[in-house]
């Protein structure tokens, strides 16, 4: 029953369509309303009304219907009999980003009514947003600078508020965010510093709009060395299988434009290089030297690849790789190319061939014959066949390889037109696997346009890409048939132009009709202004209405030049400058434009090419893309094609049937324009109902209507500005000669310019800038935004920073006193003439230098030549020694080469300064003497004796005295250098993080926080936050060395530490809340029913094992961390944890108190945080009995602490655990509720005095945890006792001799670290304090000691392989082997660091060091400038063996031994030293 009703409706609909004058209105009244199928809010939109043969006044109403109600768009009274008119309307913003709504069109008169409803998509107007970074790739520790650009679809700037912007690392951690950022005049610049050890890989900048839409931009973080030159491989785009030779050219050019001397290896492989080894073996290699232009061209014979004998090989490309090795340095860089393989020697390109044909209108074809390189082939005969039209023709290509054809379509009876063009004879091949020779041949199929009356119109355009602001002419060809034409005096053709989904232009053309004719044929021209609003694609629809209601139409798509209204130009004058010279940058744009400038070293773009910011890129942004909306099939009033249940008997009505999906009727023309039609006119081609049921998904896809006539065959590069750059202004006469201009180069940025400037009212801004010292080419561009003309982009401007000649120094990073090394100065002359040169090493009392060989101070350097001068240098002073080498071109009447040299006017002298570190021999020692001195009315003094051991290394002793007015002055100055130890694991990284929280809190509470200190501390917090995320596991936990690809186990203690630190840092920086939640969730899963926490992961600090057992000590620490994270004691996890501690305290009370000191200090602080004063007091009372009181100070020690070695000249610094315990007691006392009592403060002061004596010279302590906890205690004590006194203490230090220095401390310089060097070592000094107030005095003594035999806590053996010299010229590379075991008092050590210092002039072979991380006990390796660090999770009495290779970088004479140090990270007194020498160090070396 249902099927019968559907069939009746289908038949009724189809009959209506074929009744000549049938409509819902009487007579001949016709209606067509065209509206974009996709409408935008807050944007003027148009609806076009076409009312035809009205016989009464009507009202036209348009309304949008949604779930929220009905919104009337307009209500128009129409009195004209014929009307073509477009009305504007605006839709208010939607609550959601888009929604499908119903558009109702009602046309109502006194007698008749027409009403129709269709679905349209309404979308909120979205801004166009993109992000520009200052460069595409960053090194760890660098600053990421970026700007957010916001515009409307017309590219005018917007002041847009973005609720959120953030940066995601490769693990999708949100590492930085900004809230409520607003662009001003369309621009907002932000920056963010990467940590020193970020996760490497792709990062994302995400900008969140208020609509919820996200815009993203990617950049890369990786370690890299900028390439000094690029390699360009030039190969043909394609070859034919009949070619026997391929010419491959490889050129290597320095970034400053000069050729590279060296060697090139060219590899040519056929097939996919990622396939099997069989495919990979199909390669040829050619080696050659680069010529004077830095190039090498090779003719590679490819006959052995047998391309034409094997069908499969005919379709595989060649891959070319060229690796250039620079002469002298051995630096290698590569370039690549790809060569396609074609079956024919030439091919056809269809430049014009429409996808559809129209009966009676000629079908135009334009082709181009090109060779395998793409070059046109003139004067060649080409053939064309169109069998359905009975058309065969031949012609000769013109000088451009073009041929044109016009095919008469009148005789075509079917629905398709198959065109074949070919060159020479037709191919004899039938199967695709045929290997016989083929000639160019192409096919094109066009399908019929449907018209019931066989009437058509065709828009013909020859254009490729239309230039903006010009008139484009379109030819219209038409043929109209039908008896009803005779009653019309004229035919009116209407057209409209659309772009970006909106109707932009409308117009019409009238053609007079002679009375009584049954066919009208002709053509006319339409002139279309090409406006900016039409970029990048415009579509034009033309149609006319025949008297019987049939609509005849055609459309065409134009590619429009991607132009911008704001014309921007950036230039440098001069375009080539010396490093460090001044250059003039000029930017022109629309007046009052805000311009973002950028200039990047070309080396960066060689390393990581990026898409150039161009009009093409702008118009390809998501916000600029336009798409047609086709309603979903479930909408009941979106009718399908009309269908007939039977074939009409009138064969004149339907003489053919085009397959469904390929016919082109008016409905599809309208739909493909992006329009929805409301009409009672005939615009659809009916189809038999059974045909529609036979439609299958495998039918060929409908061809896109978005391409120009000829579809894919008329492709041209878009957005490329081919206009020449403006000529530089004429050069002025050279100025009078100045004294020799000397260049000293030391500034080498990767991004030179990153600024915002405003163009003045004349449209110009000019800036004087200093060129960096890098010898390279700078790539610069400007992005400008104007309220009047919108966005403008400059083309890339280049500035070549170049020097006619320059000098480069080769020297080691450091040497040990007594060693000698070769200092080499290489001078490169890039002038086309020879120059007399003078090279000079500036004399210094810090070293002696002897020229090597026959080198002269002056010599003649040939054109494009290089020369190296050498000196054998022996440093005489310790510390940093400067080496300054100058090279100068000198005027001389004598011949240089074969001519008298001409000295350049600029750049006649180049100077390079490098620093060498000269270290004393032996082992470094440091002692710090700290005191908290509080004076009242009477003067307070103490004596200080600086003693040196008898074996001290000569001249290595140095000392300084520091005075601070604040308890945290030293730590504030050195927050990133608190301890002189590596920071390579997750726990150690936190010493770079947590102290900044305490410093900020303390300074904020005491009102001493300055913007400078705040900025520095926040930067350190952000960097530490990034680094710590490297050590996060997927389950939310953290461990010392991270996930290790899912194999590592989270560490309970470290996770708690990170949790509390991140929670406290939230007050100062952005911390992604998910990291805190994840850590807490993971910790809660580790809690047992008893409330205690089970241990996960290794405890790398054995002090945690010193209490009752691991579980209680660990539980106390975690409870403390949870409470410091602002969790209330009522939280279920915290409440259970406190229950665990209470039960554990009862056990401890019954035991032997002395063995639980560490655990009790943690518990005291945990109960204090929970507000349980009773338990806090009980534990503190117990601890008071175990306190060690000496010299008016109080501290605690572990009974089982390691024994100190005998023979110390000074009392050694307390170990990490003792500092921790004492600091926890202070924290417990200061956390008393509601406030610490005078007794708490007094007792705390005694411990604070002891703690300050343990501080090192940087304000930290012996290790990481003690530094974090002690600084927390110091900051809380400082805040509790802080007062701004009106009286100022005066500190005096004087020696037993004549030395004396005074320091005044007041409120203005409390945080200032005042320091003076002490002249007499050894010597006796007196420190006195007068006035009133407390000061912190610290003396630091450093010296070196020769390596002595001792009884260390580690057995350490170091040797080289080979042991002895087996090369009379010296050992350039050898292996270092280490054997380590623990011999201390405990079963095993804590985490251990093995620090291997490099011999002077040697560097480690990094892959051999990295390979050690595969060993079981090696958690991490680091290669620093002069050291190799091995992180060992622990060491027992079992010997561990490691080895790696080092190689000579710079020859050094009289090589001194290098030191290897192995130490416990948390018990730094447990240390062992050894030394090693080069196998050839005892022999004379040729350096």
Curated annotation (Swiss-Prot):
Plasma. One of its GO terms (cellular component) is extracellular space. GO terms for biological process: acute-phase response; embryo implantation. Keywords: Acute phase, Bait region, Disulfide bond, Glycoprotein, Protease inhibitor, Secreted, Serine protease inhibitor, Signal, Thioester bond. Residues 1-24 form the signal peptide. InterPro entries: A-macroglobulin_rcpt-bd, A-macroglobulin_rcpt-bd_sf, A2M/Complement_sys, A2M_N_BRD, A2M_TED, Alpha-macroglob_thiol-ester_cl, Alpha-macroglobulin_TED, Ig-like_fold. Its main location: secreted. Disulfide bonds join 48-86, 251-283, 269-295, 468-563, 595-784, 643-689, 860-896, 934-1334, 1092-1140, 1365-1480. Induction: Expression level in the liver as well as protein level in plasma down-regulated by up to 70% during acute inflammation or tumor development. Residues 686-745 are annotated as: Bait region. PROSITE patterns: ALPHA_2_MACROGLOBULIN. It comes from the Eukaryota. It is found in: Secreted. It holds the Pfam family A2M_recep. Glycans are attached at residues 55, 247, 301, 321, 393, 508, 760, 787, 882, 1004, 1153, 1324, 1437. There is a cross-link at residues 985-988 (Isoglutamyl cysteine thioester (Cys-Gln)). CDD domains: A2M_2. One of its GO terms (molecular function) is peptidase inhibitor activity. Monomer. Belongs to the protease inhibitor I39 (alpha-2-macroglobulin) family. A proteinase activates the inhibitor by specific proteolysis in the bait region, which, by an unknown mechanism leads to reaction at the cysteinyl-glutamyl internal thiol ester site and to a conformational change, whereby the proteinase is trapped and/or covalently bound to the inhibitor. PANTHER family: MACROGLOBULIN / COMPLEMENT, MURINOGLOBULIN-1-RELATED. This is Murinoglobulin-1.
């Amino acid at each position: 029953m249902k099927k019968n009703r559907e069939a009746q409706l289908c038949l009724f609909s189809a009959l209506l369509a074929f009744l000549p004058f049938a409509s819902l209105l009487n007579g001949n009244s016709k209606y067509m309303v065209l509206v974009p199928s996709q409408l935008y809010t807050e944007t003027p939109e148009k609806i076009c009304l076409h009312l035809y043969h009205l016989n009464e006044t009507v009202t036209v109403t348009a309304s949008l219907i949604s779930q929220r109600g009905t919104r009337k768009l307009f209500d128009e009274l129409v009195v004209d009999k014929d009307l073509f008119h477009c009305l504007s309307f605006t839709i208010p913003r939607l609550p959601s980003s888009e929604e499908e709504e119903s558009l109702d069109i009602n046309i109502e008169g006194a007698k008749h009514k027409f009403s129709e409803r269709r679905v349209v998509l309404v979308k909120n107007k979205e801004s166009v947003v993109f992000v520009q970074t200052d460069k595409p790739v960053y090194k760890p520790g660098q600053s990421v600078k970026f700007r957010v650009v916001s515009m409307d679809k017309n590219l005018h700037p917007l002041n847009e508020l973005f609720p959120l912007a953030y940066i995601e690392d490769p693990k999708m951690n949100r590492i930085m965010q900004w809230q409520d950022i607003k662009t001003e005049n369309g621009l907002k610049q932000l920056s963010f510093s990467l940590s020193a050890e970020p996760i490497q890989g792709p990062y994302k900048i995400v900008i969140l709009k208020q609509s919820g839409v996200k815009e993203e931009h990617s950049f890369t973080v990786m370690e890299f060395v900028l390439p000094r030159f690029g390699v360009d491989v030039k190969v043909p785009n394609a070859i034919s299988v009949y070619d026997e030779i391929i010419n491959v050219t490889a050129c290597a050019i320095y970034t400053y434009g000069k050729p590279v001397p060296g060697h090139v290896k060219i590899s040519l492989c056929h097939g996919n290089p990622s396939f099997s080894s069989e495919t990979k073996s199909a390669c040829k290699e050619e080696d050659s030297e680069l010529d004077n232009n830095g190039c090498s061209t090779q003719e590679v014979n490819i006959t052995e690849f047998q391309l034409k004998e094997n069908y499969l090989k005919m379709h595989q490309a060649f891959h070319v790789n060229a690796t250039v090795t620079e002469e002298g340095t051995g630096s290698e860089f590569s370039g690549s190319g790809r060569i396609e393989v074609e079956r024919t020697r030439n091919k056809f390109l269809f430049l014009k061939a429409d996808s559809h044909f129209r009966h009676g209108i000629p079908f135009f074809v334009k082709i181009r014959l090109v060779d395998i390189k793409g070059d046109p082939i003139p004067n060649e005969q080409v053939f064309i066949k169109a069998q359905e039209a009975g058309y065969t023709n031949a012609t000769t290509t013109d000088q451009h390889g073009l041929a044109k054809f016009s095919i008469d379509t009148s005789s075509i009876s079917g629905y398709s037109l198959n065109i074949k063009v070919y060159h020479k004879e037709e191919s004899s091949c039938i199967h695709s696997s045929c290997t016989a020779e083929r000639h160019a041949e192409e096919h094109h199929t066009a399908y019929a346009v449907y018209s019931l009356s066989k009437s058509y119109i065709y828009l013909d355009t020859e254009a490729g890409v239309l230039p903006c602001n010009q008139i484009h002419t379109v030819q219209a060809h038409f043929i109209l048939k039908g008896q009803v034409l005779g009653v019309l005096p004229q035919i009116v053709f209407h057209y409209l132009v659309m772009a970006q989904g909106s109707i932009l232009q409308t117009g019409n053309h009238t053609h007079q009709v002679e009375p009584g004719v049954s066919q009208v044929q002709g053509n006319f021209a339409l002139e279309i202004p090409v406006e900016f609003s039409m970029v990048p694609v415009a579509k034009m629809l033309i149609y006319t209405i025949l008297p019987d209601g049939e609509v005849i139409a055609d459309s065409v798509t134009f590619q429009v030049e991607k132009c911008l209204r704001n014309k921007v130009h950036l230039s440098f004058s001069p375009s080539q400058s010396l490093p460090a010279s001044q250059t003039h940058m000029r930017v022109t744009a629309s007046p009052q434009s805000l311009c973002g400038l950028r200039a990047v070293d070309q080396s960066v773009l060689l390393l990581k090419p990026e898409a150039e910011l161009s009009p093409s890129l702008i118009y390809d942004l998501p916000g600029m893309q336009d798409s047609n909306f086709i309603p979903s099939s479930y909408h009941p009033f979106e009718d399908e094609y009309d269908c007939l249940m039977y074939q009409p008997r009138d064969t004149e009505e339907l003489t053919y049937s085009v397959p469904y999906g390929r016919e082109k009727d008016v409905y599809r023309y309208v739909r493909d324009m992006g329009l929805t039609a409301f009409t009672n006119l005939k615009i659809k081609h009916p189809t038999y109902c059974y045909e529609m049921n036979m439609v299958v998904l495998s039918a060929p896809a409908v061809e896109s209507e978005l391409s120009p006539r000829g579809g894919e065959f008329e492709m041209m590069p878009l957005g490329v500005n081919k206009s020449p750059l403006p000529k530089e202004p004429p050069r002025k006469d050279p100025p009078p000669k100045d004294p020799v201009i000397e260049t000293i180069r030391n500034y080498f940025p990767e991004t030179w310019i990153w600024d915002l400037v405003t163009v003045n009212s004349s449209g110009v801004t000019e800036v004087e800038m200093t060129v960096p010292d890098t010898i390279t080419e700078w790539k610069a561009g400007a992005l400008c935004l104007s309220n009047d003309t919108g966005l403008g982009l400059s083309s890339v401007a280049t500035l070549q920073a170049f020097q006619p000649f320059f000098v480069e120094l080769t020297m080691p990073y450091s040497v040990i006193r007594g060693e000698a090394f070769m200092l080499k100065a290489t001078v490169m002359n890039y002038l086309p003439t020879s120059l007399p040169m003078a090279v000079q090493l500036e004399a210094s009392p810090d070293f002696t230098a002897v020229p090597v060989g026959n080198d002269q101070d002056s010599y003649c350097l040939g054109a494009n030549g290089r020369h190296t001068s050498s000196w054998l240098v022996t440093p005489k002073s310790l510390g940093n020694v400067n080496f300054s080498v100058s090279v100068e071109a000198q005027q001389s009447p004598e011949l240089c080469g074969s001519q008298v040299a001409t000295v350049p006017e600029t750049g006649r002298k180049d100077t390079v300064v490098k620093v060498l570190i000269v270290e004393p021999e032996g082992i470094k020692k440091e002692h710090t003497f700290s005191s908290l001195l509080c004076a009242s009315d009477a003067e307070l003094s103490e004596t200080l004796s600086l003693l040196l051991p008898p074996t001290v290394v000569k001249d290595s002793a140095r000392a300084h005295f520091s005075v601070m007015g604040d308890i945290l002055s030293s730590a504030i100055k050195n927050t990133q250098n608190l301890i002189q130890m590596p920071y390579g694991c997750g726990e150690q990284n936190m010493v770079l993080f947590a102290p900044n929280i305490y410093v900020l809190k303390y300074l904020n509470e005491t009102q001493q926080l300055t913007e400078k200190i705040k900025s520095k501390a926040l930067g350190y917090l952000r960097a530490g936050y990034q680094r710590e995320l490297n050590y996060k596991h997927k389950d939310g936990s953290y461990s010392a060395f991270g996930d290790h690809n899912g194999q590592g186990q989270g560490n309970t203690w470290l996770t708690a530490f990170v949790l509390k630190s991140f929670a406290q840092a939230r007050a100062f920086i952005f911390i992604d809340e998910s990291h805190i939640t994840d850590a807490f969730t993971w910790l809660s899963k580790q809690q047992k029913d008893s409330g205690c926490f089970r241990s996960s992961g290794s405890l790398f600090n054995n002090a945690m094992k010193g209490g009752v057992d691991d579980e209680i000590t660990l539980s106390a620490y975690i409870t403390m961390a949870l409470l410091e994270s602002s969790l209330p004691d009522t939280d279920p996890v915290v409440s259970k944890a406190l229950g665990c501690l209470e039960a554990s305290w009862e056990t401890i009370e019954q035991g032997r108190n002395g063995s639980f000191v560490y655990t009790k200090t943690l518990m005291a602080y945990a109960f204090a945080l929970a507000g349980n004063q009773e338990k806090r007091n009980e534990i503190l009372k117990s601890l008071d009995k175990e306190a060690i009181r000496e010299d008016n100070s109080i501290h605690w020690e572990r009974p089982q602490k390691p024994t100190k070695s005998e023979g110390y000249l000074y009392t050694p610094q307390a170990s990490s655990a003792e500092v921790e315990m004492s600091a926890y007691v202070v924290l417990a006392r200061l956390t008393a509720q509601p406030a610490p009592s005078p007794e708490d403060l007094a007792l705390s002061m005694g411990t604070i005095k002891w703690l300050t004596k343990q501080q090192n010279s940087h304000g930290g302590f012996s290790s990481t945890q003690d530094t974090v906890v002690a600084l927390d205690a110091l900051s809380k004590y400082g805040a509790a006792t802080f007062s701004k006194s009106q009286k100022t203490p005066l500190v005096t230090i004087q020696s037993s001799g004549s030395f004396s220095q005074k320091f005044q401390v007041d409120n203005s310089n409390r945080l200032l670290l005042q320091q003076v060097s002490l002249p007499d070592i050894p010597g006796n000094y007196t420190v006195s304090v007068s006035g009133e107030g407390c000061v912190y005095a610290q003396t630091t003594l450093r010296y070196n000691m020769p390596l002595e035999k001792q009884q260390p806590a580690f057995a350490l053996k170091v040797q080289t392989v080979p042991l002895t010299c087996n090369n009379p010229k010296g050992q350039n590379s050898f292996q270092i082997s280490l054997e380590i075991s623990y011999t201390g008092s405990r079963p095993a050590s804590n985490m251990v660091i093995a620090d291997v210092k490099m011999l002077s002039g040697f560097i480690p072979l990094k892959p051999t060091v990295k390979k050690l991380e595969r060993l079981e006990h090696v958690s991490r390796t680091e290669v620093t400038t002069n050291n190799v660090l091995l992180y060992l999770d622990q060491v027992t009495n079992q010997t561990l063996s490691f080895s790696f290779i080092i190689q000579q970088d710079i020859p050094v004479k009289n090589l001194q031994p290098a030191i290897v140090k192995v130490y416990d990270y948390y018990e730094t007194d447990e240390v062992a030293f050894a030394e090693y020498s080069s196998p050839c160090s005892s022999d004379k070396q040729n350096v």
